[in-house]
Amino acid sequence: MMKFKPNQTRTYDREGFKKRAACLCFRSEQEDEVLLVSSSRYPDQWIVPGGGMEPEEEPGGAAVREVYEEAGVKGKLGRLLGIFENQDRKHRTYVYVLTVTEILEDWEDSVNIGRKREWFKVEDAIKVLQCHKPVHAEYLEKLKLGCSPANGNSTVPSLPDNNALFVTAAQTSGLPSSVR
């Protein structure tokens, strides 16, 4: 299903959730510093770059496109961290890990809307995100709890849509760390 808005097309899955994609953009493969961008609605707040998927677009491609537009970075797309559900906003977001290899001086959102970007230590990013975007903080919490390459745990495999791993705020607390 698709809905058209001026200069954007929104796509939805079978259950009516908006299909989104995002990346946790790391400065290095150690995944200790993450790039956040200023919110377009609240420029003094920080968010994880991401947005709606376009028709026929694969989640990984959408995630790479969104970080290029919003954060002005290119990089090596890594693993799918999970698919996060936001029941309030009716969104499902595919969240990937990306290691930044190129940082543009000027990029689409910096020129058009004055968007900023900044590197944060993961712990600091979680604190910043918990106030304004707790769902985004969950991405980093999940990374810390079981998907970091530094802790020896296995990574979450990419799954086809019909076998997708969905994580909601209510579900994470009771799950073993190997699946959070």
Swiss-Prot record:
Tissue localization of expression is:
Expressed in heart and, at lower level in skeletal muscle, pancreas and kidney.
- N-acetylmethionine PTM sites in chain numbering: 1
Q: Which cofactor does it need?
A: Mg(2+); Mn(2+)
Q: In chain numbering, where does the motif Nudix box fall?
A: 51-72
Residues binding Mg(2+) 2: 66
Q: Where along the chain is substrate bound?
A: 10, 18-20, 39-41, 89-91, 115, 133
Q: Does the keyword DNA damage apply?
A: no
What residues sit in the active site? 69
- Residue span(s) of domain Nudix hydrolase: 18-144
**What does the cofactor section's free text say about binding?**
Binds 3 Mg(2+) or Mn(2+) ions per subunit.
Q: Where does Mg(2+) 3 bind?
A: 66
Chief subcellular location: cytoplasm
This entry carries the following GO cellular component terms, namely:
cytoplasm; cytosol; nucleus
Q: Name one GO molecular function term.
A: endopolyphosphatase activity
The reaction(s) catalysed by this protein are: diphospho-myo-inositol polyphosphate + H2O = myo-inositol polyphosphate + phosphate; 5-phospho-alpha-D-ribose 1-diphosphate + H2O = alpha-D-ribose 1,5-bisphosphate + phosphate + H(+)
* GO biological process assignments: adenosine 5'-(hexahydrogen pentaphosphate) catabolic process; calcium-mediated signaling; diadenosine hexaphosphate catabolic process; diadenosine pentaphosphate catabolic process; diphosphoinositol polyphosphate metabolic process; intracellular signal transduction
EC number of this enzyme = 3.6.1.52, 3.6.1.61
The UniProt annotation places Mg(2+) 1 binding at 50, 70
Q: Which PANTHER family match?
A: DIPHOSPHOINOSITOL POLYPHOSPHATE PHOSPHOHYDROLASE, DIPHOSPHOINOSITOL POLYPHOSPHATE PHOSPHOHYDROLASE 2-RELATED
One further remark on this entry is:
the additional CAG codon in the isoform 2 (DIPP2beta) mRNA introduces a single, in-frame amino acid residue (Gln86) into the protein. This insertion engenders the DIPP2beta protein with 2- to 5-fold lower catalytic activity than isoform 1 (DIPP2alpha) for the diphosphoinositol polyphosphates and Ap6A, while granting activity towards the Ap5A.
Any idea what job this protein has? Cleaves the beta-phosphate from diphosphoinositol polyphosphates such as PP-InsP5 (diphosphoinositol pentakisphosphate), PP-InsP4 (diphosphoinositol tetrakisphosphate) and [PP]2-InsP4 (bisdiphosphoinositol tetrakisphosphate), suggesting that it may play a role in signal transduction.
Q: Which family does it belong to?
A: Belongs to the Nudix hydrolase family. DIPP subfamily.
Q: What is this protein called?
A: Diphosphoinositol polyphosphate phosphohydrolase 2
- By which gene is this protein encoded? NUDT4
